[in-house]
UniProtKB/Swiss-Prot annotation:
One of its GO terms (biological process) is regulation of DNA-templated transcription. InterPro entries: RetroV_VpR/X. It is found in: Virion; Host nucleus; Host extracellular space. Homooligomer, may form homodimer. Interacts with p6-gag region of the Pr55 Gag precursor protein through a (Leu-X-X)4 motif near the C-terminus of the P6gag protein. Interacts with host UNG. May interact with host RAD23A/HHR23A. Interacts with host VPRBP/DCAF1, leading to hijack the CUL4A-RBX1-DDB1-DCAF1/VPRBP complex, mediating ubiquitination of host proteins such as TERT and ZGPAT and arrest of the cell cycle in G2 phase. This is Protein Vpr. The lineage of its organism: Viruses, Riboviria, Pararnavirae, Artverviricota, Revtraviricetes. During virus replication, may deplete host UNG protein, and incude G2-M cell cycle arrest. Acts by targeting specific host proteins for degradation by the 26S proteasome, through association with the cellular CUL4A-DDB1 E3 ligase complex by direct interaction with host VPRPB/DCAF-1. Cell cycle arrest reportedly occurs within hours of infection and is not blocked by antiviral agents, suggesting that it is initiated by the VPR carried into the virion. Additionally, VPR induces apoptosis in a cell cycle dependent manner suggesting that these two effects are mechanistically linked. During virus entry, plays a role in the transport of the viral pre-integration (PIC) complex to the host nucleus. This function is crucial for viral infection of non-dividing macrophages. May act directly at the nuclear pore complex, by binding nucleoporins phenylalanine-glycine (FG)-repeat regions. The gene is vpr. Its main location: virion.
Length: 96
């Protein structure tokens, strides 16, 4: 009878530790792009909704990821990621 191979992959850190590190990185990035009062309000809303639970941690991670993604996609001034605005030719011609 065949047996599954022994796990020979790299040692992984515990999920909880990885999740908290991800949250910390997202918070540091969010502070660079959004007013602290907005982030504080978001944190308060999550805390009031979920309390001090892992579900709350996951909710704030999702929210910060979505906010940062949209922020970069719209065109953050600090990022090369995002929608590039086409400059119109000075002679008034259009490429449409």
């Amino acid at each position: 009878m065949e047996q599954a191979p022994a796990d020979q992959g790299p040692q992984r850190e515990p999920h909880n530790e990885w999740t908290l590190e991800l949250l910390e990185e997202l918070k540091q990035e969010a502070v660079r792009h959004f007013p602290r009062i907005w982030l504080h309000s978001l944190g308060q809303h999550i805390y009031e909704t979920y309390g001090d639970t892992w579900e709350g941690v996951e909710a704030i991670i999702r929210s910060l990821q979505q906010l940062l993604f949209i922020h970069f996609r719209i065109g953050c001034q600090h990022s090369r990621i995002g929608i590039t605005r086409q400059r119109r030719a000075r002679n008034g011609s259009s490429r449409s």
